Curated annotation (Swiss-Prot):
Glycoprotein keyword on record: no
Full protein name: Histidine--tRNA ligase
Gene from which this protein is expressed: hisS
GO BP annotation list: histidyl-tRNA aminoacylation; L-histidine biosynthetic process
Cellular compartments annotated: Cytoplasm
Reactions listed under catalytic activity: tRNA(His) + L-histidine + ATP = L-histidyl-tRNA(His) + AMP + diphosphate + H(+)
Family that this chain belongs to: Belongs to the class-II aminoacyl-tRNA synthetase family.
Length: 419
């Protein structure tokens, strides 16, 4: 038996095929999440998968740039596949400056990152997210977090929480400790705090030139506290920052269950475009990180030249599906119609048309199976009913309908399907 070698019959590394049960699970999640975004007044947007490489790399940081699928087209242009939707949205808004602000957009779409594939993590994957553009109000920060929590609840996540931080708080801490010049290496270490042992995180900082004493203090400060305790901490670091954060907390207390929220100064997010509040969502017993976001008040100015405050979040859809246990959704076939010869085909077509207009899914046998094989096939594809139209049925003016779940059979007048 010839054909393609095995590695060519499989998806490219880091990609996946979606068979019907998995794809219907994905579509179920899409319907659930998009309904939440729409209920908050957000409207759906889509952009090209391919962007100019310069657009993608503008504020990505070297680690993210290394993950971009980069290529030259036939005209020699440097292009890349989008790694998130925040950057493309910023580009779109850069030439749509006349849109009324704030803009509330959401998306459910594919993005691409050339990193190391892991369990539940692919190089091509779906993101659901929102972008609120044109507001610096603390109410905007609270709204986006509300929407994130509502999305997780609607998706079926019962055991989840959101860790919140503010990059400006970390910067103030580093200034206070006299290590602001080491910001990049400290951010890199903090971003690993939830994944690596303490000594490894300390080693990243000391390896970058931070003294062990200061590294220990940073590690100890970047710990989990309540949202209310964080207000006091931020006031100590910077009064204006504390006052702004206190307002966000007030709005959150009025709108979300506060037990879902924690403050953690180790949450800094890997993307370089974040400028203020940042947050990540964790779901399930194993605290699976399913998404996050934050404020990026400088990003749009890079593209449009106009200072524009903005924030948003993105959820890794496959990660969320894994965390809430939605991997397969079966969609049974309603009716499978079996006929014995071509003389009955016009009646089968009429019955199928009538049932389809009523919203049922119907398959008509292609004439390649005997009755026994047709029954076996109908059971394998999950058909709920099989309809038999033979000579005896036509002589009586009926069709025979067998319920494959209840194992009962009834006859129905053929005339009711021919009107």
């Amino acid at each position: 038996m010839s054909g393609l070698p095995d590695h060519l019959r499989r998806p490219v590394r880091g990609m996946r095929d979606w068979l019907p049960p998995q794809y219907y699970a994905l579509r179920h999640m899409e319907e659930v999440l998009c309904k939440v975004a729409e209920s908050f007044g957000y409207r759906r947007v889509e952009t090209p998968v391919v962007e100019h490489f310069e657009v993608l790399a503008k504020k990505a940081g070297q680690d993210v740039i290394n993950e971009i699928y980069y290529f030259k087209d036939k005209a020699g242009r440097d292009l890349g596949l989008r790694f998130d939707m925040t950057v493309p949205v910023a580009r779109v808004l850069s030439y749509n400056l006349e849109l009324p602000r704030p803009v509330r957009w959401y998306y459910f779409t594919k993005v691409f990152r050339y990193d190391e594939p892991q369990h539940g993590r692919y190089r091509e994957f779906y993101q659901f997210g929102v972008e609120l553009v044109g507001s610096s109000s603390p109410r905007a920060d609270a709204e986006v977090i509300q929407l994130l929590i509502a999305s997780l609840e609607a998706a079926g996540a019962s055991n989840f929480y959101v860790r919140i931080n503010d990059r400006r708080a970390v910067d103030k801490l580093l200034e206070h400790l006299g290590v602001a010049p080491y910001r990049d290496i400290i951010y890199k270490a903090l971003d690993k705090k939830l994944k690596l042992p303490r000594e490894d995180v300390i080693k990243i900082m000391t390896g970058g030139g931070v003294s062990k004493e200061i590294a220990e203090e940073i590690y100890n400060t970047a710990t989990e506290i309540t949202i209310q305790e964080a207000v006091e901490l931020l006031y100590k670091l910077d009064k204006a920052l504390g006052a702004s954060y206190e307002k966000i907390v007030k709005y959150l207390e009025a709108s979300v269950p506060m037990e879902r929220l924690k403050f953690d100064m180790s949450i800094v997010r890997g993307l370089d475009y974040y400028t203020g509040i940042v947050f990540e969502a964790f779901v399930g017993e194993y605290k699976l990180a399913v998404g996050g976001g934050g404020r990026y008040d400088d990003l749009l100015e890079l593209y449009s030249g106009v200072k524009t405050p903005a924030l948003g979040f993105a959820i890794g859809v496959e990660r969320l599906m894994e965390a809430v246990g939605i991997q397969n959704v079966e969609r049974p076939l309603d009716y499978y119609i079996y006929i014995f010869d071509d003389d009955a085909y016009k009646y089968a077509a009429a019955v199928a048309k009538k049932l389809r207009t009523e919203g049922y899914s119907v398959v008509v046998e292609l004439g390649e199976k005997g009755l026994k094989d047709a029954f076996e096939y109908a059971l394998k594809v999950g058909a709920r009913h099989i309809i038999i139209i033979g000579r005896k049925e036509l002589e009586k003016g009926v069709i025979k309908v067998r319920d494959l779940e209840k194992r009962i059979e009834v006859e129905k007048p053929l005339s009711q399907f021919l009107a």
